[in-house]
């Protein structure tokens, strides 16, 4: 009779359903702006899952980690969630800065102990698109025809004056269809010209500079004749535009000179006899 009973230990694997989602508060952020990702993990049960781990795979470039909640390690991309009971939810937020333009995908995945009855919801991804951006700068300096620097740059009425304009693009995108406009009083500055392809060309309402590459600087020379009857301050302004919507920086530059009569110049000459 002693051999009429038997026993066997059966290990029952917990049944779980881990699911993950990831969203971003702004899918079209501007360059150098802050965005926040929210990762949500839920265990739909019916049993608890232990050692739940989330892997957050960042793009190789385009985003810089700023801060996060929870036990997220930005160096490894691992978030150790720990145990999730049936119908329990865990949430992680990650704040980042956009550091490039373009489209960037961020992927996440989750796994833990137990038999996961639905693997299709263990992965998620979210995309952001950072539009083109340019940081431009323009300067204008009177560099020719100046006879005195203090207290104002002085030019002689009736003589030529030359201006040097420099347009710089600091990126991160190519500045497309850049257009330059020179604003001046044509009663004060006569016969305004700019230098192009080895020739002086009459200025007429504006100059199409075309595209300016990242870290490229374009120099434009202008020259004009100061009206012989002009006296006092002469202001000259240049402006630039581009068809890049997110354009930043300095789009206008001014230069002021003082027109004087030739007779106001004083020449000191010392001779030894």
Predicted regions and their residues:
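Exported/extracytosolic protein signature
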Residues: 1-273
